[in-house]
Amino acid sequence: FLTLLGIVAGVATVIAMVVGSLAAFALASGSARVLSGALLLPLGVSAVTLGFGALIAFDSAPLNLRGSPWLVPIVQSLVAIPFVVRTMVPVLRAIRVSLREAAAVLGASPWQVVRTIDVPLVARSAVVAAGFAFAISLGEFGATVFVARGDHPTVPIAIYRFLGSPGASNQGQAMAMAAILVVLTATVVLITDRFRVPEVSS
């Protein structure tokens, strides 16, 4: 149960970090402003709408993932990506251009500039973004309920099913799972907060 919970949330976090980090670098450089509005869409629509849309989008070739174990973390990552981007973009934009220019003058390639200047300075915000993504994935319900497999429900869905079933034992299991979820989420948030960037200045 806990292993499956961690794997699903972990995969969703990795997807959200890869896509979100690339989008954040593009937005910070000003080369992909059109992405900004698109990345806000998951925040502007309900999770139910997002999950239903994903169910339709991934239900036919060539992206037929219905019933695939990958569909749940993909949908959860869609919910988390905007938070990753919004966490990393301000830090990337605050990096002084003169630092990048100095590295380029010294002969650094664009990739070396990113690796030696941007990555170290944005590392703390990346950890915070990953923590947010993981916490969001742990508790996501609205979108996940549309795509989760019946034999592999996520914890929030399992809690919902137990609460909808009569019997004191089902209620007790729901409460126990909810308590575990709260503890895990609180732990992730507290650990993440230690890496929070206190202030971004130019």
Question: What is each stretch, according to the model?
Answer:
Residues 1-14, 164-169:
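Periplasmic/extracellular loop-to-transmembrane helix junction in inner-membrane transport proteins
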Residues 2, 41, 98-106, 174:
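Short hydrophobic faces within alpha-helices
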Residues 11-39, 52, 56, 60, ...:
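Transmembrane-helix boundary motif in ABC transporter permease subunits
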Residues 18-22, 52, 71, 78-99, ...:
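Membrane-embedded alpha-helices of multi-pass transport/permease systems
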Residues 30-33, 48-78, 111, 147-151:
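Membrane-interfacial helix termini and adjacent extracytoplasmic/periplasmic loops
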